[in-house]
């Protein structure tokens, strides 16, 4: 058999290697070019880009990287890989978009990696999560073991009691003071290896398209391949107390506002135990009944007011809400003040016939001489009709929600009824004109083991950073003015939204404030007393363990809603969550 020149054999193989994109010098560039051509066709294909999973990273390690056999398994077989709630799902653009695969499982983190060319970012494009996304607890009903016959009989015997407890819980949840339920909100933030800088975004887990805005640096236009890397996860958020104020204690009274009314007995009634029948006999609303059911053997002080009041106009700000304000005082005995003890909260109970519906409690202070002073405010131009009737109820209690040092108005405004966004609106209480960069200080503190996160609503000519608000501190917001003529905030202008994160967290040395397009997240491991290697996600100076994030459940389209225990913020039917990337100026 004749010998073949090895050089000829190598020359014959090189063209095939170049066509296949493997081996040799420049193979990576050829592979990236081929991927970019496929990606360009995918992005231009109507209407959306479907993503497939290529990596499933568990808390113990990597299950597979480029193994297509895992992707071709049935959904039931895939569950054994992704059934654990402590997993990371990685989505890329490597697979054919015409055959989107169904992914099932519960994950705490979804990572998205796309390799693009700079010119492909000029036009907006969409990213479709083809599998319905739902937020729910990891220990849902679908993962519990089947009940035995004895357990089923016991459950049936207690079913009426459970219905009654469920109804009572529903009534409590409808009342603001008992609404301590956690909710979930989706967070999208760039990974540390991302070249594209999308803005830090929070949005409800609802079906539909959510806009992600991004900045394209001039340096990126000179790169051959641009990496877009996103982390998608769900934060636990909780609504702060809005209708109750903590009782503040001060040594001396310094104010120019005089007391419009000084109360004495029998307007003051001290109840060591709260009689529900007596309280609800003259209740102002159904909410009062729900509030009274939460009373234990806690000492309660009730201040009854039915008088003609004098009103003073205030512009709102440090002193409290805007509107007409009246100050009322009451002298407490030394025994009564001591019996109340610490952690006392006050709330108004209105009379529907003789109380303005917008009457709120704006300040509550007990001085060292035993004088209790409180302000009531109504936002109107004319004084309410006389007399005004309401009750101030003071009670010692333990709250499980963040609360403010003073009335949240006019700085923090609750969202409109039925609004999809759960965040408080942060507004300017007065007209403000800025010529240069400025730091706004909002004179409110909040208390509790939570983190406040301010997400700005940027206006033309100025920008504000995303800011983490720590407990027991003022909220300080930096405003960067880019317009030469300065910027003007009209009164009640929207600055942004405020969220309170209830996920367990630890503070690290990261920056607590950054521009929206500069916020990045990092996935790292940390040794704790409970786990030798616990995976955590760090963002904006805070680290959160993956197990403390709200689980995200990816269910197949045929999955019925009753098959899984979901929270309030779930996707309706089987509509997917869509992310649209728009590149340009933020």
From Swiss-Prot:
Pfam families: Cytomega_UL84. Residues 155-170 have a biased composition (Basic and acidic residues). Keywords: Host cytoplasm, Host nucleus. A motif (Nuclear export signal 1 (NES 1)) lies at residues 228-237. Residues 10-19, 32-41 have a biased composition (Basic residues). Residues 1-47, 136-183 are annotated as: Disordered. Interacts with the DNA polymerase accessory subunit UL44. Interacts with HCMV major transcription-activating enzyme IE2. Interacts with host HNRNPK. Belongs to the HHV-5 UL84 protein family. This is Protein UL84. It comes from Human cytomegalovirus (strain AD169) (HHV-5). The lineage of its organism: Viruses, Duplodnaviria, Heunggongvirae, Peploviricota, Herviviricetes. The gene is UL84.
């Amino acid at each position: 058999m004749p010998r073949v020149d090895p050089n000829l054999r190598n020359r014959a193989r090189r063209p095939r290697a170049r066509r296949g994109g493997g081996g040799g010098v420049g193979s990576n560039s050829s592979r990236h070019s081929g991927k970019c051509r496929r990606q360009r066709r995918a992005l231009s294909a109507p209407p959306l880009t479907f993503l497939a999973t290529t990596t499933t990273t568990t808390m113990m390690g990597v299950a597979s990287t480029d193994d297509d056999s895992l992707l071709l398994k049935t959904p039931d077989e895939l569950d054994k890989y992704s059934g654990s709630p402590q997993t990371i799902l990685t989505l890329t653009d490597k697979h054919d978009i015409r055959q989107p695969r169904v992914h099932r499982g519960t994950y705490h983190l979804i990572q998205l990696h796309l390799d693009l060319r700079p010119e492909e970012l000029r036009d907006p494009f969409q990213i479709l999560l083809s599998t319905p996304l739902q937020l729910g607890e990891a220990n849902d009903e679908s993962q519990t073991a089947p009940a035995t016959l004895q357990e089923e009989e016991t459950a049936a015997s207690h079913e009426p009691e459970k219905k009654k407890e469920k109804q009572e819980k529903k009534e409590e949840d409808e009342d603001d003071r008992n609404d301590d339920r956690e909710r979930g909100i989706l967070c999208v933030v760039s990974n540390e290896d991302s070249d594209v800088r999308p803005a830090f975004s929070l949005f409800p887990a609802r079906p539909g398209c959510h806009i992600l805005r991004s900045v394209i640096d001039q340096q990126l236009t000179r790169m051959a391949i641009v990496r877009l890397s996103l982390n998608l996860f769900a934060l636990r958020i909780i609504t702060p107390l809005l209708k109750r104020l903590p009782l503040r204690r001060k040594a001396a009274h310094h104010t120019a506002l005089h007391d419009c009314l000084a109360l004495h007995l029998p307007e003051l009634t001290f109840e060591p135990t709260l009689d529900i029948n007596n309280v609800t006999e003259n209740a102002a609303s159904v909410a009062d009944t729900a509030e009274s059911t939460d009373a234990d053997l806690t000492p309660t002080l009730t201040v009854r007011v039915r008088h003609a009041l004098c009103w003073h106009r205030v512009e709102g700000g440090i002193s409290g809400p805007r509107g007409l304000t009246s100050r009322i005082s009451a002298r407490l005995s030394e025994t009564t003040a001591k019996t109340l003890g610490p952690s006392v909260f006050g709330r108004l109970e209105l009379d529907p016939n003789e109380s303005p519906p917008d009457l709120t409690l704006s300040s509550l202070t007990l001085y060292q001489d035993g004088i209790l002073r409180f302000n009531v405010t109504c936002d109107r131009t004319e004084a309410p009709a006389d007399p005004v009737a309401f009750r101030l109820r003071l009670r010692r209690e333990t709250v499980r929600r963040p609360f403010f040092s003073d009335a949240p108005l006019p700085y923090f405004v609750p969202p409109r009824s039925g609004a999809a966004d759960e965040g408080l609106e942060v507004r300017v209480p007065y007209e403000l004109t800025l010529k240069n960069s400025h730091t706004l200080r909002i004179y409110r503190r909040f208390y509790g083991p939570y983190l406040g996160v301010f997400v700005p609503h940027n206006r033309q000519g100025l920008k504000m950073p995303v800011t983490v608000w720590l407990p027991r501190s003022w909220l300080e917001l930096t405003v960067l003015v880019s317009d030469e003529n300065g910027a003007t905030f009209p009164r009640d202008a929207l600055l942004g939204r405020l969220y309170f994160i209830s996920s367990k967290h630890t503070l690290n040395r990261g920056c607590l404030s950054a521009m929206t397009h500069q916020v990045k997240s990092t996935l790292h491991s940390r040794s704790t007393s409970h786990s030798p290697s616990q995976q955590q996600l760090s963002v904006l100076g805070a680290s959160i363990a993956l197990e403390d994030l709200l689980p995200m459940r990816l269910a197949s389209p045929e999955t019925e809603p009753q098959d899984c225990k979901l929270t309030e913020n779930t996707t309706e039917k089987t509509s997917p969550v869509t992310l649209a990337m728009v590149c340009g100026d933020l």
